[in-house]
Amino acid sequence: MPLRVGTGIPGGGQRWWGRWHKSDVGGVVLNIKSEQHLALEFDRMMQIPEASAIMVQPMLKGTELFIGAKYEEKFGHVVLCGLGGIFVEVLKDISSGLAPLSYEEAYSMIHSLRAYKIIKGTRGQKGVNEDKFAEIIVRLSTLLRFATEIKEMDINPLLATEKQVIAVDARIRIEKK
């Protein structure tokens, strides 16, 4: 089975909201198909400054989604969603809502995206499981109600198919009072 390999860089290898990402420094490799290739990439990635570990995952396919959150002093936690991967930075098509969110609010966030046709499925491509996507948004917003020390969170990408939505990478910034 093809593999995905990523570095374990403190802070997720990304300065918040896309100034640089671990993929920008060669910290992500897709479709590793042999032990030799894996060993070469491991050695190379461990030379990346601040790299402390390597994560090896099965190579999954699906539509890349994004869910994030940011604590705003005046409002509390703002939950964000949209297409993930590079699309969140390039398209800047993000929907937001204040935690805690209901399922109705989560669906409204999803449906308000300009890229909703991609999520729904278009031009012969199957859509993603909106129920699972909405459920993750609601559960994240509920978590934030109780985990007030979370100041920023980024789950990107989530890989979504018509059956499932799986988190591939995540980053959380915590501040204790």
Residue ranges with predicted function:
Residues 1-177:
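ATP-dependent carboxylate/acyl-activation modules
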